[in-house]
Amino acid sequence: KCNAAGEPNVIFLETELAREFGEGCRVICPITDPYVVHHGALGSAVTVYLPDGVDERAVADWIAALDGVTEVHTRESAMAKLELPGDRIGDLFVLSARDWVIGRTPEHHDLSKLEDTLRSHGGRYEEMVPFLISEPLNSRYAALAKGDPRNFDIFDFVCNGIQS
């Protein structure tokens, strides 16, 4: 999440949106827990609420062209492609590149508290988490494991997929 000099690669998206479209866009970072020494409350995924009258497509296209952004989804697209609950996300959902993070404004993120290199959560590059199960899987779950199991599938695999 840092450049070659070790400095954080941060897109302060709410600041950039205000500069381009005026005040009123609100960026929410789901990773806003108080333990900030690794991630500075910056994330690889944010949701954006747009004020009335703003052209959603124009904003989405503009965000998509920013260095460090890999995906911009409308609420409907995020629901369908990312399985996100539509009542808990904004008008747009934005994902960053492997070595980038997204935040609101510099004032919302105190990077002086970082103790080491910047880490993050929530993006495509953090979703590949290995399953380690101490027993062999039955044939049905062994076949499922060759697909694209998600982190929350581990409970199903452990409870129902172990060979008897």
Predicted regions and their residues:
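Feature captures the catalytic ectodomains and active-site-proximal regions of enzymes
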Residues: 1-164
